[in-house]
């Protein structure tokens, strides 16, 4: 025959050798597989294989490895089982044994071990609630990708979602096809394409009325919704196709492990406004076009149907124009994917979504959060998670689109208390089972530094916060509506177009806007921790920040406020005290207290907004809201009805920090300075009006300290701020109580050493330089007064009484929290989340600590990146974690004597350059705090060094030496003491005043010896936590906090946080009166030291506020853990707040995003701050 093709190919000898070897190996492997499938190894087969090994040049090791492969192949094993019966692998197993057995290896210890363990524990906990893999073998996994084109109509949208054949969908059009092509081009094999069945079973509520088959369909907005048949739903908006594919890919990669059946709905941004979404998903959009709002929004936000987001099934696909009204009542044109940004995140179990719509005219922000229980660890409430979405979804939005409205919906109870629409700001509070989100937006946008978005005169951008608990990804997007009221979020408006959401399922999810403002960063670990997510939105890279930290089981309250208008109103929920303070550009502060909320939040005048989140989940109906503190740019808000909340902002991720950090820092520093001045001016004048005027409260802090009677009431209110910390516990109410008590102590310490704190903050430094020394000397008495006041209110507080119940949990969970929080400290959000996680899973303290560590590590890592002090951060984190291990679980403080000392030394070295004494004292605190101190001292050193150093300089050495030793020992002592103290707590509350008083002077003395004070307060704190310590502590904190707020603004409050921390801690100690006296000498100094350190830190932290925040957060975290521990953490947290006040704002936002979890203030409030902390 003629040769049709060449018989010799262009192959070199080497190539031929390689191909031959491949053929030989494949042939041998094929023979082994065939013989294995026939049955057990016989003598004949063995001889045949021996011959083949020689012919094919197979080594003995290769032969044994192939045999092991065949033996371990379930497919071959199954075939052999059917062909030759059971027990057909014994000889094969013998033949496949290794000549040299593998040596057992030690478990490697790396920097990520703690994080990995925490994640593994969290995942194991979640998986424990899932069916065994064997039980799911025959179940269909549904992955639906709906890629709807922009032109698809709502009906068509519903069709594509059901058929999962979208116009543009790359996936095969036939619903029966087994392959789904992701937009990114990757393919997913699915057993069944129909998403509806899977979804209906797990969550009928999620089903949208319009389309049963589509879990989430968002037409208007580019969105990615991933819904697990379980309670997990993740929806991510994507502005661009490629981004969508990336999101899709990341979601697909990350979600599958956590959710068994995963439903992914990918919707390309479409002009259609109708969205069919499962109830769980709440979409918040501020879109130029009124029809843009997804029906979910329309339904939930629908003014006419204000309350019906509750039932998922009830969710109507039809989008309401009314919702549109909110976005831009006037604009009917859909800007397309660019202008509209919608982010919805539903966590696997709990789904929490915050929606904010900025109206053109009224710049209204609406937030709807579905219950935020973390799916696995929530002790609350698997059932709640399922139920709540429906009930919680209901959002009351009573205001007309033009009038900003705060609408509050409680997940559990439909009862919503809608405060009258605020003058300009609109506040929406939604309480989900685990999370309460309050969004407040002011119409006028004094905040926005750039009117760049002014370009869109009609677009007003409102931050969108998505909170998911339990590993849900949270994204915050700033979207601008093409409305006349672009004032507030002008810059964000630009960002909506340029927003891009990058989500790594496990990693941080952040949305970045073209304008450069940072939207959200959610650290993976935090998200994974479950129940903790922090979303931070910075508007025009300045003051607007939205942070939500969903607690796994306890509700979080997130208040997002923008200072757009002159008047700011805070709305509270009926039965729950929510205090929100907005800082107006004008500097006006209007506080709307919820009935029962005693303290008003005080805000310093500044265009920066302040957010406070307070929510009692179950604790004292409205009286004790477990609060998530929102960090306010340059402002701290204290005072929630019985709890004091400290707003701590976590430092933003490195990338975020870079973008907004400078501007924010400037704003913060300016604000701080202003606050300082006002504080100085107002210090004497307004301690009484602490509740009344947020700004003045700060200033009044000093006065408050002096005038203890008035502050007591205020303080009571203030404790809610502290409360946030405690809210970290799984039972928000209960844990909050325990945490609260710690924060209360902190606040007192701050109050006592408010001057120190002030010095910490630059403005405070100035204010305090004059008064720091005076107050440091006189402060002890003031502290004492404060403490006593606090003590008095504590016993009086109903919260306190409630707190005993929680305190019981708190005692048990508090320990978990403490361990958990230290890492959480890094990000308050993490902390809160951690706290809540432990609380939720009363199951495992150990697990909680792991989680906390994870969040800390993640937060720290991110924060460090932001701070550019990763090493220090990591060290801090590690130390924190290690220390946590070292310390008793009760204290929850992770202190390592050597690491801590090193850290303090390092911090001192760092701060020595700027302000050695103040930094060292701060550093002396906990390692985390120490590091932060160093950074802070670098930035604030000049201003703070003088004021802080003077009072603290002598103490610094002590702090350094003692912090490690005292702090450590104190911590240990406290740790050992906490249980008794906790048991003693109820009694302690009355004693608190005396103990606190005693300790306060100590604190004052130990202004430099912050560490020592820390230790002592911690012990008292734990006791407080245990009985009604959280309540009492919170109350104390609230009291101190109210007092402190009166002093200087945020600065003072920050200072108060720092100082009050010690003071508050002592107060907590007071609560556990034993603690106060017992740890009095050591504790007092310790507390003082911590507050002083915090104060010193405040200024320094401005520069290195990110680190500071992180460090502080661990301390903060620690505090929640045990009342005493909490105390320790809180002081730093407060300090961080101070820092946050000035510079930390950015960081906090970033942190919050990371943690986003919000609680810690992180949850949006400071969840992130603390969350990030």
Swiss-Prot record:
GO terms for cellular component: nucleoplasm. This is BRCA2-interacting transcriptional repressor EMSY. Gene3D superfamilies: ENT domain. It comes from Danio rerio (Zebrafish). Residues 961-976, 989-998 have a biased composition (Polar residues). Residues 149-179, 191-216, 676-720, 797-816, 905-998, 1020-1046, 1139-1173 are annotated as: Disordered. Homodimer. Regulator which is able to repress transcription, possibly via its interaction with a multiprotein chromatin remodeling complex that modifies the chromatin. Pfam families: ENT. The gene is emsy. It comes from the Eukaryota.
